């Protein structure tokens, strides 16, 4: 037996007991006759005391260094009051060592384990097995385990079945590029790794498994924008004989109970707000707004139709918008800060930023545009934006998509500057009534906003043939603190409707049969009404753990270039393997 207890287990009630611990040397302090070692495992830290009364153990303690793997036997004793460490769960006791054995020595680690070292992330990823020893990483992975376990227990109690679906599937054009796997047994043919189990879970509904879930691994060969990973984990769910409210109510109950169990210190407003897609875009410029703060967009377009200011007027005459954000109490912002905000909206596509400062002393307004307005127009803007002395008004004029993108960036930037987003608040909300399709100007065709299996709203079905851009979907996104936490929809369950949507998306009958024939045929054998959702596990745990990226809550993540620095994947393979697969590599020129 290597250990009788863990390093986080011993308490004053164990005083006088002979115990055996095993773990890593966290810290070592040598005072000659006395050597103190903090012994660590994932459960905690115990202080071990080596003294010359036990010379063999003391000699071992003289040789060990940080991260040695050590086994220690000794007697638990109460620490003197002045030596109690309130920062440790075991801080009231210590272990007086009588025997010690080095189970494995260790080289000097390239990163600090006992504290955050500030090293480059690439070093952490290369030595991930060392980085994972750190308290922060252990805390995150334990939280992840608790989240997944809670979900499994909750859904089991709700009558769901956890069913595994294949990893090797058929390649179909669902969105991002597939990861392809060549078939040795069928030369020239390929499997794909699933971007999601979307079609398979719908087929499970056809099969009669009315409540399905899976902690599903998903793969997308896409450009690694911002905080993405080529492989990720989602809670995949599907239910039969449900409408949108049934799905939303279940998920809301689950996430409310989850958060109150695993992060009880966080504030969780309930019930979750519900906003239509149109309302979210109008008020926040985003379909995943952070609702922990205000800074809502204010539409000024109708006030400025006849304005003599040509910048605003030309935009409005070309179908654009004029919208602004009131930054309360920000009249003190310097010109340098306003220039920085201008760069923020330019990153969203805007050509510039109009601004006005309402001084606190009742003095003259400073503005980049007010002097160009007609009498009364600036006063109308101030009234519409409910501005007060000491406020800063920030306005963008452009086409609606640019106004939304740029003011969304501005809103988030202001919230960060003003520290408006409470990290201890979890603000969930539902975004509903998405458009079913959007026009792809480059390809001159309609694209599905979510995926081609999303059902249109019944009351909009008549518009499919005449005005598809106005058709709303039975789709919904769960958002959390400015992130999309999960997306779902009620699905199409009739072959004729599915074929109509394929046709709208420019998928011919031949293509539909080749790519989705199994789905279309299944719908002819009694497919029930069904719907589901797929919240992302990585993103959820990242937010609950107050981490900046999903890499901090994954055991072995890849870089933004999809490289595993620890194992050097991807890597070349043996020529023999390529021959077996009938593959020849043609390098790009």
From Swiss-Prot:
Annotated binding of L-aspartate, by residue: 174, 220, 450, 491
Subunit structure: Homodimer.
UniProt GO MF annotations: aspartate-tRNA ligase activity; aspartate-tRNA(Asn) ligase activity; ATP binding; nucleic acid binding
Function per UniProt: Aspartyl-tRNA synthetase with relaxed tRNA specificity since it is able to aspartylate not only its cognate tRNA(Asp) but also tRNA(Asn). Reaction proceeds in two steps: L-aspartate is first activated by ATP to form Asp-AMP and then transferred to the acceptor end of tRNA(Asp/Asn).
Gene designation per UniProt: aspS
InterPro entries assigned: Aa-tRNA-synt_II (IPR004364), aa-tRNA-synth_II (IPR006195), aa-tRNA-synth_II/BPL/LPL (IPR045864), Asp-tRNA-ligase_1 (IPR004524), Asp-tRNA-ligase_1_N (IPR047089), Asp/Asn-tRNA-synth_IIb (IPR002312), AspRS_core (IPR047090), GAD-like_sf (IPR004115)
NCBIfam families: aspS_bact (TIGR00459), PRK00476.1 (NF001750)
Organism: Chloroflexus aurantiacus (strain ATCC 29364 / DSM 637 / Y-400-fl)
Record-given protein name: Aspartate--tRNA(Asp/Asn) ligase
Chain sites annotated for binding ATP: 220-222, 229, 484, 536-539
Region (Aspartate) residue spans: 198-201
Keyword annotations of the record: Aminoacyl-tRNA synthetase, ATP-binding, Cytoplasm, Ligase, Nucleotide-binding, Protein biosynthesis
UniProt EC number: 6.1.1.23
């Amino acid at each position: 037996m290597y250990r009788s207890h863990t390093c986080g287990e011993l308490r004053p009630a164990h005083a006088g007991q002979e115990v055996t611990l095993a773990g890593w040397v966290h810290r070592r302090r040598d005072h000659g006759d006395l050597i103190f070692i903090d012994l660590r495992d994932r459960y905690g830290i115990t202080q071990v005391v080596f003294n010359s009364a036990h010379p063999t153990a003391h000699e071992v303690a003289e040789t060990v260094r940080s991260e040695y793997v050590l086994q220690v036997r000794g007697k638990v004793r109460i620490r003197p009051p002045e030596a109690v460490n309130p920062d440790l769960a075991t801080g009231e006791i210590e272990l007086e060592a009588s025997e010690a054995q080095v189970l494995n020595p260790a080289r000097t680690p390239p990163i600090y384990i006992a504290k955050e070292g500030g090293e480059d992330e690439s070093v952490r990823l290369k030595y991930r097995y060392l980085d994972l020893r750190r308290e922060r990483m252990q805390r995150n992975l334990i939280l992840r385990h608790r989240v997944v376990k809670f979900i499994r227990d909750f859904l089991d109690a709700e009558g769901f079945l956890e069913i595994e679906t294949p990893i090797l599937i058929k390649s179909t054009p669902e969105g991002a590029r597939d990861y392809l796997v060549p078939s040795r047994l069928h030369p020239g043919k390929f499997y794909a790794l699933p971007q999601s189990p979307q079609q398979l879970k719908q087929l499970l509904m056809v099969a009669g498994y009315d409540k399905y879930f899976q902690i599903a691994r998903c793969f997308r060969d896409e450009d690694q924008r911002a905080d993405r990973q080529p492989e990720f984990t989602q809670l995949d769910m599907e239910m039969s004989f449900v409408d949108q409210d049934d799905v939303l109510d279940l998920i809301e109950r689950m996430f409310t109970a989850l958060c109150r169990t695993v992060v009880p210190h966080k504030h969780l407003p309930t019930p979750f707000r519900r906003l239509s897609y149109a309302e979210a875009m109008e008020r926040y410029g985003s379909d995943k707004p952070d609702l922990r703060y205000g800074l809502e967009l204010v539409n000024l377009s109708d006030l400025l139709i006849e304005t003599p200011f040509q910048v605003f007027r030309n935009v409005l005459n070309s179908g654009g918008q004029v919208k602004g954000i009131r930054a309360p109490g920000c009249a003190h912002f310097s010109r340098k800060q306003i220039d920085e905000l201008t760069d923020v909206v330019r990153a969203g596509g805007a050509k510039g930023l109009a601004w006005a400062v309402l001084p606190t002393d009742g003095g003259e307004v400073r503005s980049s545009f007010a002097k160009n307005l007609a009498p009364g127009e600036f006063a109308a803007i101030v009234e519409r934006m409910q501005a007060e002395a000491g406020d800063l008004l920030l306005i963008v004029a452009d086409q609606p998509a640019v106004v939304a993108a740029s003011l969304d960036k501005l809103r988030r930037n202001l919230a960060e500057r003003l520290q408006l987003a409470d990290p201890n608040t979890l603000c969930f909300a539902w975004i509903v009534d998405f458009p079913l399709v959007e026009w792809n100007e480059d390809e001159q065709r309609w694209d599905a906003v979510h995926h081609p299996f999303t059902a249109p709203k019944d009351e909009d079905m008549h518009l499919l043939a005449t005005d598809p851009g106005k058709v709303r979907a039975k789709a919904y996104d769960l958002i959390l603190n400015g992130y999309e936490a999960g997306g779902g929809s009620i699905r199409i369950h009739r072959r004729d409707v599915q074929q109509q949507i394929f046709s709208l998306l420019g998928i011919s009958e031949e293509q539909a049969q080749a790519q989705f024939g199994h789905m279309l045929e299944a719908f002819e054998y009694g497919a029930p009404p069904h719907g589901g959702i797929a919240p992302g596990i990585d993103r959820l745990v990242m937010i609950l753990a107050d981490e900046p990226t999903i890499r901090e809550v994954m055991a072995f993540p890849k870089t933004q270039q999809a490289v595993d620095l620890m194992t050097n994947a991807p890597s070349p393979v043996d020529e023999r393997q390529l021959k077996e697969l009938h593959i020849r590599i043609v390098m790009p020129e």
